[in-house]
Structure formats: structure tokens, C-alpha cells
Amino acid sequence: VATSHLAPQESLKLGKFCSQQKVKHIYTHLMWAPEYSLEVGKQFIEDGGMVELTAVTFGGFVHKRKLAECVEAINTLGAKNLVLSSDTGAVRSMIPSEIFRMFSVNLSNAGVSDDDLNTMMKKNPLAMIAE
């Protein structure tokens, strides 16, 4: 279950319910808006969920947040709790594979390890859908 654009408090309630039901769940669009804060992400993880960081939020076509804030989120929340995504595909956005490639290269250049990138881009998404 993904939170989509629910308000943070609704997302946290949904996350707790999903944990009780043993349903995998992910908090989407962390830091897209001020109320989608790192603190909300921490709470969602504590309640058993995963958190998504998107290329659109951190250096995508609208550049809402700085890449350094994404690196800080990775270091704070831990790669084992995160999924990276493009969050693109709309008419006015970049090609998903290209923005995702650029996002991963930029994160690597900013010091995120290859192991962490593989965890967030391959291992965790696979675990969400196949395990």
C-alpha cells in the first residue's frame, strides 16, 4: 500500500493499520512538501513501513529540494528503509529511465555508496513486490 498524497497524519494512521495487518506499505513523496517531513518519515519507518525518495523532489524537473537534503535523508533514515523512484511519466516530465539514471549518478557523486544505491533501487523495491 502506498500513501500517495494523503496528509501526513492520515499516512501515519494508514501505516500503523498496515503494520497490524502485516501488509507492506510505503510513505511516498517524502519532503515533497514541508509537512512531508523527515520526522514523519522516521515515524513511518518506526511503525514498520518503507519510505520513498523521488528524483522529482530532489533535483527533478521542479527542483523542490537540494540533492544534499536527499543525501541527509538517506544517512538519517538508512538505505535499508528507503526506495528511490523517478516519480515521472507525466507529459511534462522527463523520461523516467533518464531522470532515474541522472538521480543515481548525482547521488553517487554526492557520496552515496553503490551498495546503498543498489539497496534502494533494486533490493528494497523487489522486496516490496515479490517477498
Language model features: what each stretch is:
Residues 1, 51, 87, 117, ...:
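Divalent metal-coordination and catalytic microenvironments
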Residues 1-36:
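Divalent metal-binding pocket/active-site signature
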Residues 2, 24-26, 48-52, 81-83:
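Structural preference for beta-strand elements that scaffold enzyme active sites
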Residues 6-7, 31-32, 56-57, 89, ...:
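Catalytic metal-binding/acid-base residues of hydrolase active sites
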Residues 11-17, 36-44, 61-73, 90-105, ...:
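Histidine/acidic-residue-rich catalytic or RNA/ligand-binding cores of hydrolases
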Residues 28-50:
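Histidine/lysine/aspartate-rich catalytic loop segments that bind and position anionic ligands
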Residues 54, 79-96:
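Short acidic/histidine-rich active-site segments
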Residues 100-131:
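Mid-to-C-terminal alpha-helical segments outside catalytic/metal-binding sites
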